[in-house]
């Protein structure tokens, strides 16, 4: 894999490190503060399902024994772990979600840092943290899509710098993580497909192609990816509920995914996309700018296929069934954050070459902070004023989630 040239933020290492770290710590601290303030928001519908099944699992009851769902049981298991650690309450579940989103922000930082340097990493991580609390994507709730993103990014990170030294074991572990992402929710399998395509692309771009190594890596990736599902099927079979699992998560899920027409799906997509964009227009514009600058910045060209492929398969992950629920868009947030980091780094390069009088890093950080502030102010009542119960009512309208507690 070609090594990227150093990005221009290295021209002011001390100054940039100070301002970028301050900005990142401020944003992450603010986001954590908001999540902690809202720990007691009543569980919504999907959270209630995951929590109930997770609670049954802690009591030794298998999924699909008393509760039927078309979702694979990964997120239910994650809830069981969270409740075992933080308690079987809404606050405990949301504290676990806070840890998950912070870990994901760290993954986004590493991913963007490899692409375009430290500056891009901190802007991308800060962008993800802000995106992840958006009411428009139901980011304050512990949806399965949050749990898909973390292992998916971890697996992709293991494969990002794929060269001759990468062992088959590392590829297998990446497959395990990507398989775990799919176990959290079936649509997470799209990230496994991206990983397979990336492995193929890296190999066929080499001057000397090693087909045996390519087949070995694809085999290890596929084996690792299937292991979580195989293990799950074995456990469910041991509990005597495999037939129910197969009925609900394959037969019923397939029928459910075929209900929506293409026209209806496109209408939903544009409707939800508009709501998501309007919730943080400045941050989304920063991401769109990153998509454009991706083609302009020479240092980014070795990663062009990676970023575009990641974006394309992230979009594919929200498409199954064409339902385009608001929380499906959580799967797009790592891509959006990554592109925001690209925009910041590429913008810094352009400003540095133009001999801009103001410090380029300071200007870009101020622009990012302004974009984040705009998003926070747009939903300020939810983030800073309303009680947890009122927040639930504001986001979910007439759904009686508070009353069901």
Language-model segment annotations:
Residues 6, 10, 191-226, 291-299, ...:
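Perimembrane helix-loop-helix junctions
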Residues 50, 180, 207, 214-300, ...:
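Transmembrane-lumen/periplasm boundary regions of multi-pass, lipid-linked membrane glycan transferases
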Residues 155-173, 200-207, 282-303, 344:
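Membrane-interface transmembrane helices that cradle and orient dolichyl/undecaprenyl
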Residues 161-179, 209-220, 302-312:
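Short hydrophobic alpha-helices at membrane interfaces in multi-pass membrane enzymes
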Residues 170-186, 191-196, 227, 311-319:
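Membrane-interface alpha helices of multi-pass inner-membrane proteins
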């Amino acid at each position: 894999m070609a090594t990227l040239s150093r990005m221009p933020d290295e021209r002011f290492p001390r100054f940039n490190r100070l301002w970028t770290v301050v900005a990142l710590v401020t944003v992450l601290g603010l986001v954590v503060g908001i999540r902690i303030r809202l720990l007691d928001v009543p569980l919504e519908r999907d959270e209630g399902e995951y929590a109930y099944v997770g609670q049954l699992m802690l009591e030794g009851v298998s999924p699909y024994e008393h509760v039927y769902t078309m979702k694979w049981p990964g997120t239910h298991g994650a809830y069981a772990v969270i409740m075992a650690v933080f308690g079987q309450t809404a606050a405990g579940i949301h504290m676990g979600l806070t840890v998950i989103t912070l870990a994901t922000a760290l993954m986004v930082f590493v991913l963007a840092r490899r692409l375009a340097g430290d500056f891009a990493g901190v802007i991308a991580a800060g962008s993800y943290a802000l995106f992840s609390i958006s009411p428009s994507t139901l980011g304050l709730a512990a949806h399965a899509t949050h749990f898909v993103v973390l292992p998916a990014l971890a697996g992709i990170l293991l494969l990002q710098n794929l060269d001759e030294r990468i062992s088959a074991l590392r590829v297998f572990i990446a497959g395990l993580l990507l398989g775990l992402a799919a176990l959290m929710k079936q649509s997470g399998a799209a990230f496994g497909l991206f990983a397979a395509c990336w492995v193929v692309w890296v190999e066929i771009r080499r001057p000397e192609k090693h087909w045996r190594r390519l087949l070995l890596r694809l085999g290890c990736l596929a084996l690792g990816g299937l292991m979580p599902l195989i293990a799950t099927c074995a456990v469910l079979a041991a509990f005597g509920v495999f037939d129910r699992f197969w009925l609900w998560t394959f037969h019923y899920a397939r029928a459910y995914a075929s209900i929506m027409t293409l026209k209806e799906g496109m209408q939903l997509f544009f409707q939800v996309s508009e709501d998501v964009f309007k919730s943080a227009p400045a941050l989304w514009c920063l991401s769109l700018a990153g998509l454009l600058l991706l083609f302009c910045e020479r240092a980014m060209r070795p990663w062009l296929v990676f970023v575009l492929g990641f974006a394309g398969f992230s979009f594919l992950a929200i498409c199954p069934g064409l339902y385009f629920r608001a929380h499906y868009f959580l799967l797009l947030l790592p891509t959006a954050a990554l592109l925001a980091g690209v925009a910041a780094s590429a913008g810094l390069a352009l400003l540095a070459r133009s001999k801009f009088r103001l410090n380029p890093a300071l200007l870009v950080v101020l622009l990012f902070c302004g974009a984040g502030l705009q998003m926070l102010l747009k939903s300020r009542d939810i983030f800073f004023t309303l009680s947890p119960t009122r927040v639930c009512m504001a986001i979910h309208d007439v759904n009686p989630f508070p009353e069901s507690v």
